[in-house]
């Protein structure tokens, strides 16, 4: 994996660790809610970009039409990196959160973010680490 991709993956892991702190926070606090929303969106965006890096560099998948998150998620599912259904749901939530001007959307999805989505983001982190470790061994 090239340096740019490695840095993106490191940023993803740091962002995910920060997001995971939401599990210990009081979700009735509006500041915590808005922080969880922002951190989820950032972490999700880093995740699909890391997926794209892996697909291009380790699976030689380069036939993306637009390179959109939806397209990358579908390719990542076909490569068995993720479960497509939950990730499409997460994409939908991320898109809705971008237009959450009064905090109602994050209130609606906060429990899913904390109890389900963080776990899926952690699962992908583990899969990505395994793929990258295998690739590093192949380099030797």
Where are these regions (language model features)?
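Solvent-exposed interaction patches of small proteins and small membrane subunits
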Residues: 1-140
């Amino acid at each position: 994996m090239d340096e740019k991709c490695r840095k993106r993956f490191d940023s993803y892991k740091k962002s995910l660790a920060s997001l995971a702190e939401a599990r210990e926070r009081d979700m009735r606090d509006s500041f915590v809610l808005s922080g969880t929303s922002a951190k989820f969106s950032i972490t999700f965006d880093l995740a699909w970009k890391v997926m794209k890096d892996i697909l291009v560099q380790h699976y030689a998948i380069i036939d993306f039409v637009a390179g959109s998150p939806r397209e990358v998620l579908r390719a990542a599912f076909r490569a068995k990196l993720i479960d497509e259904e939950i990730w499409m749901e997460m994409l939908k939530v991320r898109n809705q959160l971008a237009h959450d001007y009064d905090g109602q959307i994050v209130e609606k999805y906060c429990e899913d973010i904390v109890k389900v989505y963080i776990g899926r983001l952690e699962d992908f982190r583990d899969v990505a680490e395994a793929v990258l470790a295998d690739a590093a061994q192949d380099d030797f």
